[in-house]
C-alpha cells in the first residue's frame, strides 16, 4: 500500500518568526536543497519545495472544450482557476493511470500564475546537499528542463527546473486558457454582499 500523503502548504513550511530568516546571509550554494519527490509515468523526479505552494489529493477538474492533451483540466482552487498539467503526456512517458493516490502539486511562479502538476504520487520530501546533485548537460534535456540528478538510497531522482517545464509559447497558451477559465469561474460565482 502506498505511503500516506500529507497536504502541505507553503505557509506551513515557512514561519515568519523562523530563526532561519535571521542572522548573517549564507550563500545559497552551500545550503541543502529541499525537494518534493514524485513519481510520474514510471519515472522518479523532483522539484524544489520553494516552488511548491501545496500538495493535494486529486480533485474534481473542469474540462472545457479545446484543452490540449497535456492539460487534464482546470482546478478551482478557492476561486482561482489553476491549469492541471499532465507531465506523462508532456514528457511522452508511459500513460499515467489516475487513481486514488494521484496527486496534484500546485506551483507558483511557473507560468503567469499558478499551475498544478498531475503526478502518480508524491513519495517523499528530501533534503539533498548541493554537492550530491550531478548536473545534466545542456543538450541532454529538452529546454534544459532536467537540471540535475541525485540519488536517495538507491533511487535515481531527476531534478526538474519548474520554470523550464514549458516553452515560452506553451506558457503563453496556458496563460490564455487560465484567463478564460478564470473569467468563467467569475461568471458562475455568487457575489457575497
What are these regions (language model features)?
Residues 1-193:
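An acidic, low-aromatic, low-complexity terminal/linker signal
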